[in-house]
Regions:
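Generic N-terminal amphipathic, Lys/Arg-enriched alpha-helix
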Residues: 1-12
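Residue-level detector of functional hotspots within protein domains
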Residues: 4, 22, 64
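Active-site-proximal beta-alpha core segment in soluble small-molecule metabolic enzymes
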Residues: 10, 34-113
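A short, N-terminal amphipathic alpha-helix
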Residues: 21-31, 48, 69
Length: 113
């Protein structure tokens, strides 16, 4: 094994473990017919998106930057949820996401108009 740098923090991803987890996720999908989305807030290592996209159906994004990341690097379905959608940024949100979650009646009104 190659020596790992110890002078700075880093993430070490184990492809075998990711693949094993994806196999379990596929079993759940096959047994239930459900759709499984990845929350970019929890895991946004776009370098492994091609591997994840073989099993996962898409992503959820809670910021415009996450929505853009999903659109650019993760094929499939994209869902957005945010405490606040700004009128200025919302047209860009619609370029990146197919559906949106509203967190208040005011957001429902905003999203419908």
């Amino acid at each position: 094994m190659t020596a790992l740098p110890n002078d700075r923090p880093f993430y070490l991803l184990n492809e075998d473990k990711i693949t094993a987890n994806l196999a379990r996720i596929q079993q759940v999908k096959d047994a239930t017919g459900c759709t499984i989305l990845m929350a970019l807030k929890a895991f946004s290592h776009y370098q492994v998106f091609p591997l994840l996209a073989q099993t996962l159906d898409g992503c959820t994004a809670s910021s415009l930057h996450e929505a853009r990341l999903a659109h650019e690097y993760f094929p499939g379905y994209h869902h957005a949820y945010s405490p606040a959608y700004s009128p200025r940024d919302f047209p860009e949100w619609t370029d990146y996401s197919q559906t949106f979650t509203a967190n208040s009646l005011q957001q429902v009104d905003f999203l419908q108009n």
